[in-house]
């Protein structure tokens, strides 16, 4: 079920700075709700034409994802607010509670494992509600052409933070479709071939157990 959509700050111009921050904050909470999995990036003097080119490449490589420049301090607090609000029966955050004083007080007490990343000029790359190693691989391949402009700081994946090294390892995990295809291939193999595979696996297990036995 799709969660309710909040008013987006980008679609409304408000002169009052506090109201603008409030709209932006709500917009970020909604963005996190739509994509709780995202990469955290630091951008360095990225020119408008470079940003446009980067977005075009990412859109082609990872359809459905989005690169968005953020205001780090506001997004950071929005993430804490998102984590502090109890979910509705459909798994969504109650957007009516986002700007309540009680919610903000509760959010201030929350500690995140990526608290130290929200420094400097930042952007996020959304990965959607379901974590996809394939999407991360697509992003990493595009990132190679912007090494001096975009720095990968980490990832927020399934409510946990990971550093760039862990992101690299995560990107190497085979997709679910690949695993399903491999399993189907094995199951559809001739019985004799399947037996050889099982015998080989059994031999490997036996060898491993022998190696682990304490020497007399």
From Swiss-Prot:
Compartment(s) of residence: Mitochondrion
GO CC annotations on file: mitochondrial large ribosomal subunit; mitochondrion
GO terms under biological process: mitochondrial translation; translation
Transit peptide, residues from-to: 1-9
Chief location: mitochondrion
Disulfide partners: none
One MF term in the entry's GO annotations: structural constituent of ribosome
Protein keywords: Mitochondrion, Ribonucleoprotein, Ribosomal protein, Transit peptide
Gene3D superfamilies: 3.30.70.1730
InterPro entries xref list: Ribosomal_uL10-like_sf, Ribosomal_uL10_bac_type
Source species, domain of life: Eukaryota
Summary of the function given for this chain in its UniProt record: Component of the mitochondrial ribosome (mitoribosome), a dedicated translation machinery responsible for the synthesis of mitochondrial genome-encoded proteins, including at least some of the essential transmembrane subunits of the mitochondrial respiratory chain. The mitoribosomes are attached to the mitochondrial inner membrane and translation products are cotranslationally integrated into the membrane.
Recorded family membership: Belongs to the universal ribosomal protein uL10 family.
Subunit comment: Component of the mitochondrial large ribosomal subunit (mt-LSU). Mature yeast 74S mitochondrial ribosomes consist of a small (37S) and a large (54S) subunit. The 37S small subunit contains a 15S ribosomal RNA (15S mt-rRNA) and at least 32 different proteins. The 54S large subunit contains a 21S rRNA (21S mt-rRNA) and at least 45 different proteins.
UniProt-recorded name of the protein: Large ribosomal subunit protein uL10m
Native source species: Schizosaccharomyces pombe (strain 972 / ATCC 24843)
């Amino acid at each position: 079920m799709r969660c309710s959509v909040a008013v987006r700050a980008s679609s409304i111009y408000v002169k009052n700075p506090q109201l603008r921050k409030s709209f932006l904050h709500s917009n970020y909470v909604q963005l996190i709700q739509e994509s709780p999995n995202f990469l955290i990036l630091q951008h360095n003097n990225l020119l408008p034409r470079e940003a446009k080119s980067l977005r075009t490449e990412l859109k082609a490589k990872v359809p459905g994802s989005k690169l968005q420049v953020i205001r780090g301090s506001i997004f950071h607090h929005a993430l804490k607010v998102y984590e502090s609000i109890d979910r509705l029966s459909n798994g969504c955050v109650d957007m009516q509670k986002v700007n309540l004083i009680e919610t903000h007080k509760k959010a201030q007490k929350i500690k995140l494992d990526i608290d130290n990343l929200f420094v400097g000029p930042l952007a996020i790359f959304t990965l959607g509600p379901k974590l996809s190693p394939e999407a991360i691989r697509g992003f990493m391949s595009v990132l190679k052409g912007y090494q001096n402009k975009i720095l990968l700081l980490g990832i927020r994946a399934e409510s946990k933070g990971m550093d760039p090294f862990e992101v690299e390892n995560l990107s190497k995990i085979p997709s679910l479709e690949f695993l399903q295809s491999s399993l189907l291939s094995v199951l559809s193999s001739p019985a004799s071939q399947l037996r050889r595979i099982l015998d080989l696996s059994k031999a490997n297990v036996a060898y491993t157990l022998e190696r682990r036995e304490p020497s007399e």
